From Swiss-Prot:
It comes from the Eukaryota. Its main location: endoplasmic reticulum. One of its GO terms (cellular component) is Sec62/Sec63 complex. It is a single-pass type II membrane protein. Acts as a component of the Sec62/63 complex which is involved in SRP-independent post-translational translocation across the endoplasmic reticulum (ER) and functions together with the Sec61 complex and bip1 in a channel-forming translocon complex. A cycle of assembly and disassembly of Sec62/63 complex from sec61 may govern the activity of the translocon. sec66 is required to attach or retain sec72 in the sec63 complex. The lineage of its organism: Eukaryota, Fungi, Dikarya, Ascomycota, Taphrinomycotina. It is found in: Endoplasmic reticulum membrane. This is Translocation protein sec66. It comes from Schizosaccharomyces pombe (strain 972 / ATCC 24843) (Fission yeast). Component of the heterotetrameric Sec62/63complex composed of sec62, sec63, sec66 and sec72. The Sec62/63 complex associates with the Sec61 complex to form the Sec complex. The keyword Manganese does not apply.
Length: 192
């Protein structure tokens, strides 16, 4: 009687473990099909806006499509710049053994996705206006630089307040030290 239960328990455990492994494999495959750029950077709203404008019925105006494409290209360039900075840090971590192969593979996929995105932007720009693919990235780079300058300018008033306070404290300390030196010099001369 005991001998009949042992094979049944064995088969049940075997089938359960096979089911668990197959479920794990299917789940991991579903996660890999998701674009890596969404995991890394979040959703690309400018790309979504551009594609929604393309699919509008009646079609959107060319100027609106071009503006949306410039926004999409600007976001693509921002992501590319972040990837370049991250690549250097990732290489340092890789040399030290601080990251695994999975992260390296994901980062490689992310770089390829970004390159494909930029190539698609260039093709789309050329289809909207022939020859525009050569100038769109220059325009986007200027937009990014302009945003950097504006962020620096926006931080200037905050810096002015802190610099002004520091200057006032240093001025008081300097005047006190100067007064002390003046008194000491007068004592040495015998004036006091």
């Amino acid at each position: 009687m005991v001998s009949i239960y042992v094979p049944l328990i064995y088969i049940t455990i075997l089938m359960g473990s096979m089911y668990g492994v197959s479920r794990f494999v299917r789940k991991s495959k579903n996660q890999e099909s998701k674009p890596v750029s969404e995991e890394w950077f979040g959703e690309n709203y400018s790309r979504n806006i551009f594609f929604s404008l393309l699919q509008q019925n009646p079609p959107a105006e060319d100027t609106l499509l071009k503006a949306a494409l410039v926004l999409r290209a600007t976001e693509g360039l921002r992501r590319l710049m972040k990837l370049k900075v991250s690549r250097m840090a990732l290489n340092n971590l890789l040399n030290r053994g601080g990251v695994g192969d999975e992260l390296i593979r994901k980062f490689g996929r992310l770089e390829k996705e970004t390159e494909l995105e930029l190539m698609d932007i260039a093709k789309t720009a050329n289809s909207l206006q022939p020859g525009w693919n050569q100038f769109i990235f220059q325009t986007c780079n200027e937009i990014i630089e302009n945003e950097k300058i504006h962020s620096i300018i926006d931080n200037i008033p905050k810096d002015i307040d802190s610099i002004s306070q520091r200057w006032q404290t240093e001025k008081i300390l300097y005047e006190a030290a100067d007064e002390e030196l003046r008194i000491q010099a007068q004592k040495e001369l015998g004036v006091l």
